[in-house]
Amino acid sequence: MGQRRAALGTVSGPSTKPTLVVLAAGRARRYGGVKPLAPVGPRGEAVIDLVASDALAAGFGSIVLVLGPATGPAIRYHVEHTWPAHVDVRFALQQVPLGTVHAVLSASEHVGDTPYGVGNADDVYGRSPCSLLAAHLMALDPTNALVGFRLADAVVGTAPVTRGICQVGPDGQLRRVDERRQVTAQPDCRFAAADGREPSELSPDARVSMNLWGFTPAFHKTLQAAMAAASDASEDAEVLLPEVVAESLDTSPFTVLPAAGRCIGVTHPDDLALVQGELARQVGQGVRPAALWAPGENV
């Protein structure tokens, strides 16, 4: 199975379902473990299992996992021994941690010259938001895109988090992403950022970025150029996706796709029980299917 999954290949053709590049190379220092393998599902399913199954059910055709040398072997072993054999999954290695742009470019040979999605390996985005992105990427002439979640739907627990607050124009285009730190939920359903900046109070309806992106082939070239420029300046320069997006908005517009439903992520160890409870609640309410994969799709 491992040799089959390691086979190289590109995704091409205008009618091809898009690929989702899943960034799983992080060290997760705050969590203290391999976050993509955290057992969050009702049956002990890992975060990365839900990320992949939701994406495939929503219209993505293949998954590319960008792994790091420290946690990559454990993640790859898990995938090769638990995912259904028919799932089209490829592996890419980010040997050196040079930021999220470098991580995406590590998957270049697998995405081909077609639009593709990018997401985190430790955020359960849900099927509806993934469906929004997949449908957008399969449009006749797609733009770059960012899936925007309500702030109230993108915070789990009471521990402080960092969130990118999106400023969206009347045309639905992204104007900027304002990173706010120390964001916490308040008792009266408000949100506050204790980062010394104003406004300190944040609207629960504000759209935030949870790093669920859609990129066109033209923007992929922009990422390559940004990484090359940074590497020329310093061999160990880290380049982050939000920074390149912000610098490119004048020439590379991004459509904000407003998502409904919660984005459930694991940031701190104390989040695990909360995430498990939320996912179990979704299954009980019929929002999420009880079985991770469709009947007959077991390994």
What are these regions (language model features)?
Residues 126-213, 217:
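Conserved core of the sugar-phosphate nucleotidyltransferase
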Residues 27-32, 186-188, 222:
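Short acidic/His/Gly/Ser-rich catalytic and metal-binding motifs that mark active-site loops
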Residues 22, 48, 107, 122, ...:
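Residue-level signal for inorganic ion chemistry
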Residues 37, 166-168, 256:
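A structural signal for short hydrophobic beta-strand segments in well-ordered beta-sheet cores
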Residues 35-40, 161:
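Short glycine-enriched, charge-decorated loop/helix-capping segments at active-site entrances
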Residues 1-7, 11-16, 52, 140, ...:
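Terminal amphipathic alpha-helical/low-complexity segments used for targeting or macromolecular assembly
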